[in-house]
């Protein structure tokens, strides 16, 4: 069922011939092989063409791009006729990523190939960061005079800062992946852009998970919008042609399991989602050096690549010939939204994304347009992560379990090769550590915090999966049980880090020079500490001698004073004794004198 505000449309696809469109658009649709409209197209195109603002929520792969591209081209064609071919900016499509913007631009170009040559041409311009400067974009705009702009928010806001861009003629604005454009990352830029545009315009919001945008929708300036929701009364939030499986895996064997699936499963093109840019760069390098995959054409893109490199890699994967080999794209969520790559029939997620809505977008890169597709997510083999299955079922996505392949022998062989590769180049180990630390940070940001908890993460198994020689020192290591923590963090045989060299001679030279400087600094510091200690000891000894001398002086003084006092006391007693003896002697003399006088008588 389709719910469009207060009325209901049957989810039956309609023939394109029943749609009131420009003849050249009918020719384009017929040539592209589309025999009937999808439900979202059948409901949206008449309303969006008929001066209605629309809010469209439909599952991935349901044909939303054509649902807004055709109304935009219809409106631009009418404006061109009304203005007798006069050029002006009539339509704007805003996308959150360069890749999606480039894809939308390609869809417009495909349709415009059927535009009548005797009419003034309709032109589009792609305005995204890194491909060109703002000045170059402005020069191209002034020279080509496009009627339609497909852009990313940041660059478009910079573009509109120039008075050379006349915005008063804009008739239609489309926000593709609107929930992403209205979240905290882009909302301010998008709202600022919309405020610069005429209020009397038609606005369309399109996404697979628009409900998460919440009240932000009301900041887009829409007038009495019509909400269109495809299959909103069904529990399933994925296309029926898409099968979603989950697999419980021990963390250390994840890469071995991935290699097994990429080697044994039947598919044409596969997208493998890694959690971070660092992990994409690291494992792409591992696969390039160890060559564990035969007859597989490997490509990688991530958010840290420059725009030109990203578009080149995406085009390589998109245009890959499936008749000659399998094609695998290692990527992050930069390739999760809106990207429509033909013949992608397998999606593998090493770990669930931090945002549950992104899980649906990742899975939706396959099983598009009623084609059969399969998505597999690996969950760490513990009780908590298994709860993610129930968590997603509440959100309308049912998953069935598939058994993990037996990869013990393959894991041991791969780990041995990876360790040997590590020992050849210190830089490779530093890249692995960066990817490992990035994953731990990524894991801590999960929305489902009750399921993905740092306390329950298997850090040892994860470190082995990344091929680390030694656990890095980080706060989260406190969650590793003491009985599992290896001695000094070594995950294998201990190596001498001073002799662990870079393969790049220039980097190794710098390392050795730095190590020598640090060693000399340590020696000099130790020497200075020793000298300071001796100096301190000398000063301390001198001070002690001085204090001892002073103490002896005071002691001698006290002793001298005591002796003098004693002498004084003794002198006083002797004088008393002498006086007494003198008196006795004097008395004796007197007595002797009297006795002599009697003798004379």
UniProtKB/Swiss-Prot annotation:
Stretches for region Disordered: 532-576
InterPro entries hit by this protein: CTT_SPB4 (IPR056330), DEAD/DEAH_box_helicase_dom (IPR011545), DEAD_box_RNA_helicase (IPR050079), Helicase_ATP-bd (IPR014001), Helicase_C-like (IPR001650), P-loop_NTPase (IPR027417), RNA-helicase_DEAD-box_CS (IPR000629), RNA_helicase_DEAD_Q_motif (IPR014014)
GO molecular function: ATP binding; ATP hydrolysis activity; RNA binding; RNA helicase activity
Helicase C-terminal domain ranges (all copies): 257-419
Pfam families found in the cross-reference section: CTE_SPB4, CTT_SPB4, DEAD, Helicase_C
Catalytic activity: ATP + H2O = ADP + phosphate + H(+)
Motif (DEAD box): 176-179
Enzyme class at the top of the EC tree: hydrolase
EC number, UniProt record: 3.6.4.13
Family: Belongs to the DEAD box helicase family. DDX55/SPB4 subfamily.
Listed name of the protein: ATP-dependent rRNA helicase SPB4
Species for this entry: Meyerozyma guilliermondii (strain ATCC 6260 / CBS 566 / DSM 6381 / JCM 1539 / NBRC 10279 / NRRL Y-324)
Gene that specifies this protein: SPB4
